[in-house]
C-alpha cells in the first residue's frame, strides 16, 4: 500500500516574477484563466468558496465562477443555503482556484455582495431548463427523506411552470470584491513563487512576493 506521506510531485513547468505580471490582478487572473482554458484544464471555473458562520466555524465547498469583471468574481446559488446564511451574517469570504495541470493556484480574499436583480435574472434565464426547475425544487442544505422527494418537487414545478419558470426569489448571484489576490506557481524543491496583490486605500494595487 502506498504511504500517503510518500506522495509528492516536484513542480517545474513555469516561474512567476513581479516584472512579468500585469499590475492589475484581475487582468492577471484573466491571463492565467485563458491559459488554463487553452490547456484544457477540466472545470477551469471551479473554485473553492470558504465562508465562516457566526460562531467562527469555517465551511468550504466548490462553486462555479460565472462572471469576471473589473469589480470581481461572480457566482450564483440559493440565498437560503448554508453559505447564503453565512454570507448574510459575515460577508468576508475567500476563493481558491487550483489548476493542477499548470501547477498553479489563485487565492482571493474579500467581501461579498449580492449582484443586481437584473444580473441574477439574466444568468438564471440562460441556464438549461432542468437547472432552472432545480432551483425551485431544491431547498438547498435542508434535510430530505429521500431522492424521490426532490424528483416529485421537480415534477410539480415542471407542471406548474412548463418551460418558462421565473427566477425564484431565494436564488441569485453574489460578487466577491477582492481585497487580496495571490498567484501561486509551483517550483522545484518546494521553493514556489507566490505574488500577492493588496488593494490600497486609493483603489490601486501593491504587489509583494511571499515566502513559499
UniProtKB/Swiss-Prot annotation:
Amino acids binding substrate: 8-11, 66, 123, 127, 131, 190-192
Keywords: Flavoprotein, FMN, Oxidoreductase, Pyridoxine biosynthesis
Binding site for FMN: 61-66, 76-77, 83, 105, 140-141, 184, 194
GO biological process, one term: pyridoxine biosynthetic process
Enzyme class, broadest EC rank: oxidoreductase
Cofactor field: FMN
Cross-referenced SUPFAM superfamilies: FMN-binding split barrel
Statement: the UniProt record of this protein carries the keyword Transferase: no
Family listed: Belongs to the pyridoxamine 5'-phosphate oxidase family.
Subunit structure as annotated in this protein's UniProt entry: Homodimer.
HAMAP family: PdxH
Descriptive protein name: Pyridoxine/pyridoxamine 5'-phosphate oxidase 1
Organism: Ralstonia nicotianae (strain ATCC BAA-1114 / GMI1000) (Ralstonia solanacearum)
Name of encoding gene: pdxH1
